[in-house]
Amino acid sequence: ENFIRKRFHDHTIVRYPELIGVCKNKNTLMNFFFNHISSSNKFSAYVDAKRNLLDVEDALCLTFYFLKKKKFKEINIANQKYYKVLKIIKDIEKLIDIPAIYYIKKNKFINWKIKNHVNNKILKILKIKFDKKYLSTSINKYFA
């Protein structure tokens, strides 16, 4: 980011949380959990940690919305909700009907917050709903 700021006057930096979508990278949070659970491989989980997850299609929709406005040099695009790691694991277990095998680790880290440019007005315009079903719907969409 500093490289871009120093060298380009006209720029936009877009930051995202963990994205849910089709990705060949096995080390993304969602692929890691899905691959370990579906193959019954044991893993460690900070079950009390919270993560911000966003469907990649919603990320694109929000990105284009902000880029059209042309008034931001830096944009933080995120879900308004944070999900406990245990909830993410449980939703994947429910989808594939395989119990996760994991060691519970205590969270040594402070859960982080993102200064989010996304607000309810924008979500209403774009018809994006971060409701109770958002996480499970997004997981089903890409991992079913």
Can you name each region flagged by the protein language model?
Residues K26-N31, L60-C61, K90-I92, H117-V118:
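Short, glycine/charged-enriched secondary-structure capping and boundary segments
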Residues R7-D10, D97-A100, L126:
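A short helix-to-beta-strand connector/capping loop
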Residues E1-I4, L60-T63, I89:
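Short-chain dehydrogenase/reductase
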Residues I20-C23, S44-K50, I75-Y83, K105-W112, ...:
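Glycine-rich Rossmann NAD(P)(H)-binding loop
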Residues N2-R51, V56:
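NAD(P)-dependent short-chain dehydrogenase/reductase
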Residues V56, K84-K90, Y103-F143:
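Conserved C-terminal active-site "lid" loop/helix of NAD(P)H-dependent oxidoreductases
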Residues Y65, K94, K141-A144:
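Residues within well-ordered alpha-helical secondary structure of globular protein domains
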Residues L62, K69-F109:
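Mid/C-terminal beta-alpha module of Rossmann-like enzyme folds, strongest
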